[in-house]
Structure formats: C-alpha cells, structure tokens
C-alpha cells in the first residue's frame, strides 16, 4: 500500500533454503516466495544470497533487487561464501553489510577486510577460476562506501549537488613503517580497522564527530 522498501534474507544457508521450500512448495526457488507477495521489486534489499544460483541472480538483476553482502556473518554462521565476483560481473547492485546479529563488528572497514578474505577463499576453492576472482582492496572499499550510498539515490563518490557524507581517516596513529603509497595506506587502514584513525564523521554536510 505504501510502497515501502523491503529488506530480508535470501538463500543464506542450506537449512534456511530447505525450510522455505517446505513452507512454499509451490515456489521453485526461494526468491519466488517474495515475488508471490509483491515484495520482489526495485529497492528491495536481500541479505546474504550465499547460495543464489545463476537463475536467482538473474531474477535479482532484472527486478532491481539489491544484495547486502555480509561476509563476517556468513563465516561466523558457517553459511558459506557468497559469489560476489559473479554478482558484480553480472551487473547486480551489491553493497557491504555488517549484520548486527551474526557479524562480530559494525565497522565497515572490518566488513571490507572480511569480504576480501572470503572472496580469496572462494577463489582458491574454485580452482582459481577467473569468474571467481577475489575482491581487490579498492573494490571492497567501494562496496563499503559508495555502493551503499547509491541505494539512496546519491551518485558514487563526491558529486556536485549531493549532500556530503564522509569519514576523515588519519593513519598517523598506526605503527610507523616504511613510506607507503596511497593504495598501501588504504590497505593498511582497512586491515588495521583501528577506531583511532577516525577523525571526523560528516553526514549531509554536518559534522557529527
């Protein structure tokens, strides 16, 4: 009635998939249970999608459904590793999530590091197939920041006319090392996940911290 956005789970683990199949035997796949009730639409967010096959992913792309990738939760609950590389290659909208229940931390830097680690494991156990290539540091950082921002209609990065949403990070508090290139500094910030590096948080142009 109110066209509100919907957020739920999809194909998180084997037991959940079997449970949904038992509840809705008329649906061939998990995603069809949402479609049956009019919830499979643009703006819907589905968390996990660990076991979403090609057909389910295609249904997500065509409907404009987003993926909330929660690697830390998926590891903690031994659900598996989501096919993030395939999702990105197929044009799905993906952003990182912490999962307040199954995840160990709310930090998006931690989520980015976990996403990289999980994707490397998937890449290795796939036999290092190119279509399962692991996430790079810039890709994971993008998924933790600008990717989610686009869900709310803002352009990626800093665009003229958009409200400013930013976090100011200062890596001088981290242990000294040899001189680092900008890409190496970003990598260290992500893997260190040290709250001391956060100097300011700005939302809609207003400084919160």
Regions from the PLM with identified roles:
Residues 1-66, 78-94, 156:
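Histidine/acidic residue-rich metal-binding segments in metalloenzymes
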Residues 34, 60, 87, 112, ...:
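A generic structural signal for nonpolar/aromatic side chains embedded in well-ordered alpha-helices
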Residues 36-39, 43, 85-175:
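His/Asp/Glu-enriched, well-ordered alpha-helical/loop segment
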Residues 46-48, 69-72, 96-99, 204:
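Thr-Gly-centered strand-to-loop micro-motif
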Residues 54, 75-76, 103, 176:
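Short glycine-rich, flexible loops that bind phosphorylated cofactors or substrates
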Residues 76-81, 105-107:
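Short, charged, surface-exposed secondary-structure boundary motifs
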Residues 163-209:
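C-terminal cap of metal-dependent C-N hydrolases
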């Amino acid at each position: 009635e109110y066209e509100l956005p919907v957020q739920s789970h999809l194909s998180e683990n084997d037991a959940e998939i079997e449970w949904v199949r038992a509840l809705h035997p008329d649906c061939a796949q998990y995603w069809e249970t949402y479609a049956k009730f009019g919830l499979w639409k643009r703006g819907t967010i589905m968390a996990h999608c660990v076991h979403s096959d090609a057909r389910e992913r295609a249904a997500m792309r065509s409907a404009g459904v987003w993926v909330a990738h929660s690697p830390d939760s998926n590891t903690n609950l031994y659900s598996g590793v989501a096919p993030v590389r395939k999702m990105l290659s197929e044009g799905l909208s993906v952003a990182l999530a912490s999962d307040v229940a199954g995840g160990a931390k709310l930090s998006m830097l931690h989520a980015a590091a976990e996403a990289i680690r999980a994707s490397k494991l998937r890449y290795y156990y796939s036999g290092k197939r190119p279509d399962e290539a692991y996430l790079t540091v810039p890709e994971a950082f993008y998924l933790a920041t600008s990717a989610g921002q686009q869900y709310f209609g803002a352009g990626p990065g800093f665009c003229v006319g958009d409200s400013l949403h930013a976090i100011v990070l200062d890596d001088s508090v981290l242990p000294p090392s040899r001189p680092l290139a900008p890409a190496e500094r970003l990598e260290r910030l992500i893997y260190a996940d040290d709250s001391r590096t956060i100097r300011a948080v700005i939302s809609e142009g207003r400084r919160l911290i």
